[in-house]
């Protein structure tokens, strides 16, 4: 690939830790047309879609990379099924309401995964001395200044392999394992976009931006699952009530909303989009063929984050007005369909559960 147009110390480069959103909007308004004009000069024979198809044919994964991801995806699916069987039995033994019996394994699995991968991502971004892309986002392009393809960090290779496998598993899980929700179709699309983003950024060696995307997302997912698990576990069919789960759930929900705004909306815009939609144009390779597609995917993910924040804001508003527990308002409203309140539904589900013969 052709080296960057500027180096990071050039006086015309706007370099900061966290970009001002208004300033960033003006920079992006200039950087995107600049990239297309420059690319037209570099590849005057480019025509859409034939040239893009030709570019896609030039990239591929090695057999070892592909098999590693597929094996990991299979392992994730096996572990998810195993955990589901074990925890559904556990929910019966611990008097969890039947309507939560399938939700507990799903949330516990996601909490385990997202918590683990985010801790590893935190280690990479905050504890590895070779770079500091979180506090200096434009520095993710420094290694391109030599003119060659930068060497990929082993931590990033681990992140990409594990996350790619998880999204392949998640496509299957959304269709066949997870509770279907109002936004499941959007989640399904999200998984494909995430896979496409991982693949294209990997073959273009834009892996540091990709690692930052994942770092800014997984902590809110983990906090959401803590919130959901707390409310699933606080009240039991034997009329026991665990107040500490209630308190933990409320605290986790508040933390979840704060993390979403800071990480997925503010820092995603002012660090990640600043470093990619603006920084990559001037500091990354000039002839990266998939830059427009990668940029579009990043913007789509941001739009999804804004859309999902709609659910969070509605939940906060409902809790503030009614004092009810923050429940997942993406789920299909069983109460409205049946005409029964949740307490009556729980009583009927519990009665039905008690009529079932117990396994010896």
Curated annotation (Swiss-Prot):
It catalyses: a sphingoid base + a fatty acyl-CoA = an N-acyl-sphingoid base + CoA + H(+); 15-methylhexadecasphinganine + a fatty acyl-CoA = an N-acyl-15-methylhexadecasphinganine + CoA + H(+); a fatty acyl-CoA + sphinganine = an N-acylsphinganine + CoA + H(+). It is found in: Membrane. The keyword Transmembrane helix applies. Its main location: membrane. Disulfide bonds: none annotated. SMART domains: TLC (SM00724). Its EC number is 2.3.1.-. The chain crosses the membrane at residues 59-79, 156-176, 195-215, 243-263, 289-309. One of its GO terms (cellular component) is membrane. Keywords: Lipid biosynthesis, Lipid metabolism, Membrane, Sphingolipid metabolism, Transferase, Transmembrane, Transmembrane helix. Pfam families: TRAM_LAG1_CLN8. It is a multi-pass membrane protein. Pathway: Lipid metabolism; sphingolipid metabolism. Residues 117-321 form the TLC domain. The keyword DNA damage does not apply. Belongs to the sphingosine N-acyltransferase family. This is Probable ceramide synthase lagr-1.
């Amino acid at each position: 690939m052709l080296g960057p147009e500027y180096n990071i110390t050039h006086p015309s480069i706007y370099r900061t830790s966290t970009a001002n959103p208004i300033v960033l909007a003006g920079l992006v308004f200039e950087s995107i047309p600049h990239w297309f004009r420059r690319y037209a000069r570099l590849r005057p024979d480019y025509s859409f879609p034939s040239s893009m198809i030709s570019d896609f044919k030039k990239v591929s994964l090695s057999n070892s990379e592909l098999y590693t991801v597929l094996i990991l995806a299979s392992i994730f699916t096996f572990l998810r099924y195993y955990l589901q069987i074990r925890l559904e039995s556990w929910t019966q033994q611990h008097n969890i309401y039947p309507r939560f019996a399938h939700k507990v394994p799903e949330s516990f699995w996601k909490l385990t995964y997202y918590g683990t991968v985010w801790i590893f991502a935190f280690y990479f971004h905050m504890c590895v001395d070779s770079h500091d892309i979180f506090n200096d986002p434009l520095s993710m392009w420094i290694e391109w200044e030599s003119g060659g393809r930068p060497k990929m960090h082993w931590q990033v290779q681990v992140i990409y392999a594990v996350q790619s496998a998880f999204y392949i598993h998640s496509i299957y899980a959304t269709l066949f394992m997870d509770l279907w929700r109002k936004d499941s179709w959007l989640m399904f699309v999200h998984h494909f976009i995430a896979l496409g983003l991982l693949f294209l950024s990997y073959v273009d060696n834009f892996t540091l931006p990709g690692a930052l995307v994942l770092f800014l997302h997984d902590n809110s997912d983990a906090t959401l699952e803590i919130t959901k698990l707390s409310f699933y576990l606080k009240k039991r069919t034997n009329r026991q009530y665990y107040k500490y789960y209630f308190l933990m759930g409320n605290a986790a929900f508040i933390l979840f909303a704060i993390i979403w705004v800071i990480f997925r909306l503010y820092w995603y815009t002012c660090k990640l989009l600043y470093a990619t939609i603006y920084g990559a144009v001037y500091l990354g390779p000039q002839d990266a063929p998939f830059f427009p597609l990668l940029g579009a995917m990043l913007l789509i993910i941001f739009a999804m984050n804004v859309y999902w924040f709609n659910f969070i804001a509605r939940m906060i508003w409902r809790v503030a007005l009614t004092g009810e527990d923050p429940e997942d308002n993406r789920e299909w409203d069983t109460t409205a369909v049946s005409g029964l309140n949740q307490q009556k539904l729980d009583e009927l589900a519990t009665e039905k559960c008690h009529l079932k013969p117990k396994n010896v």
